[in-house]
């Protein structure tokens, strides 16, 4: 049977909550402590756990207690750390993980999570991931949270991880760069990278941290309802603050109900359509960019014949149901249409996974589409991320097609034994 897990995040997700849910699920804290010693930073922190109550519900709280604390000038209202006494660049962290002799799967997951987090922070600040120097990635507690979570999932033998929609939270929080709105910019970038479904539960606290978002965005195969599974254990990981709802991350652990069948994933999408016959064609390109920037999943046009024998176009926009109002506003504002049709449809999708590939010309992302899980997983398509390849081509003065082929060849070389 294929072992799977589902992260249910009604009150958000953070690294320490992930650790708590894993320990509550049966991962020995002593195992995590011994494995984490291989990072050779054990003198900088103490890892311990306790049982706590959140709105009357018993859960496990894992603490990453720093040996040396820097006093903060700005006490934070949020539940998680943003001020740390030790910062590191991404290459230093990657070198630390690679040299730690961790279990192979734990090592690869940890590297992928940190890379994804650095890409998000780099995008926020306009710098390359390798040059990111900020507290969230380099802090001891973030290292322990991420590597510890990957160790725990590996110890449980999880072959596929899924995640629920995420609450946005609200308010503001103090961070290394001053006061930031919640969700903080890095979290939004991470959500954007996987088009994570989000919602507001009207709680004005930081509910999703960059560390928690990076873990989910990197490791989860799909966001939404729980997959078909036989539930064997549910681990409860406690957050730090009391909230109007139990501040608990629930980790469902079990086996796939249909391990021999190809797992089909589906989601709800909105389709917007309008015919236009009196718009300057130059405006269409601008409308495309505006809609995609607003969160549209896809935008396209078709040539059509309209009344009075006029040539026109059918503008179609595909977006999540939550983005309908935003996309409609752009269409009304930027085009000459007087009406828009929209409908909700089911869309069957493949599982999508993003991996970071390092080549001689730099780092590029690769998107992998697959069906099934565990031993029944079949990779159907692999594509190099266009924007990343363009950037590498411009920097290296190499043809774009050559860069794309190098990225794909590198991925196939690294994964040929897994396919």
From Swiss-Prot:
Sequence segments annotated as region (Disordered): 69-90
Keywords attached to this entry: Nickel
Top-level taxon in the UniProt lineage: Bacteria
Record field: compositional bias (Basic residues): 79-88
UniProt entry tagged with the keyword Metal-binding: no
Any one GO molecular-function label of the UniProt entry: nickel cation binding
Alphabetical list of HAMAP family matching this protein: LarC (MF_01074)
Family: Belongs to the LarC family.
Protein name as it appears in the record: Putative nickel insertion protein
């Amino acid at each position: 049977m294929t072992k799977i897990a589902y992260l249910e995040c009604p009150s958000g997700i953070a690294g320490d909550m992930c650790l708590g849910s894993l320990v509550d699920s049966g991962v020995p804290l002593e195992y995590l402590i011994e494995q984490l010693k291989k990072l050779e930073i054990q003198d900088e922190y103490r890892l311990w756990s306790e049982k706590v109550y959140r709105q009357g519900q018993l859960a496990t709280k894992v603490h990453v207690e720093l040996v040396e604390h820097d006093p903060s000038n700005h006490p934070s209202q949020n539940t998680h750390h943003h001020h740390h006494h030790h910062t590191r660049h991404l290459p230093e962290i990657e070198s630390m993980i690679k040299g730690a002799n961790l279990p192979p799967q734990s090592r690869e997951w940890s590297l992928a999570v940190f890379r994804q987090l650095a890409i998000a922070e780099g995008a926020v600040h306009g710098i390359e991931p390798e040059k990111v120097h900020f507290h969230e990635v380099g802090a001891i507690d973030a290292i322990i949270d991420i590597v510890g979570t990957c160790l725990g999932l590996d110890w449980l033998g999880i072959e596929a991880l899924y995640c629920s929609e995420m609450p946005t939270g609200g308010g503001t929080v103090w961070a290394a760069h001053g006061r930031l709105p919640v969700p903080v910019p890095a979290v939004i970038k991470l959500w954007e990278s996987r088009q994570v479904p989000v919602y507001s539960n009207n709680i004005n606290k930081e509910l999703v941290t960059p560390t928690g978002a990076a873990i989910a965005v990197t490791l989860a195969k799909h966001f939404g309802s729980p997959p078909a599974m036989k539930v064997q254990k549910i681990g409860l990981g406690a957050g730090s603050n009391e909230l109007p709802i139990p501040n608990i991350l629930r980790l469902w652990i079990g086996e796939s109900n249909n391990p021999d069948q190809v797992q089909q994933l589906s989601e709800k999408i909105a389709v917007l359509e309008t015919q236009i016959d009196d718009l300057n064609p130059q405006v269409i390109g601008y409308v495309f960019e505006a809609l995609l920037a607003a969160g549209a999943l896809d935008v396209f046009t078709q040539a059509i014949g309209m009344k009075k024998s006029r040539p026109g176009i059918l503008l179609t926009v595909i977006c999540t149901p939550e983005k309908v109002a935003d996309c409609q506003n752009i269409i009304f504002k930027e085009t000459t249409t007087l009406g828009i049709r929209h409908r909700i449809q089911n869309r069957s999708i493949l599982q999508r996974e993003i991996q970071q590939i390092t080549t001689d010309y730099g780092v590029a992302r690769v998107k992998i589409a697959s069906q099934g899980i565990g031993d029944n997983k079949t990779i159907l398509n692999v594509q190099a991320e266009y924007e990343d390849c363009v950037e590498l081509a411009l920097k290296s003065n190499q043809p774009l097609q050559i860069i794309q082929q190098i990225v794909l060849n590198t991925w196939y070389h690294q994964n040929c034994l897994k396919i």
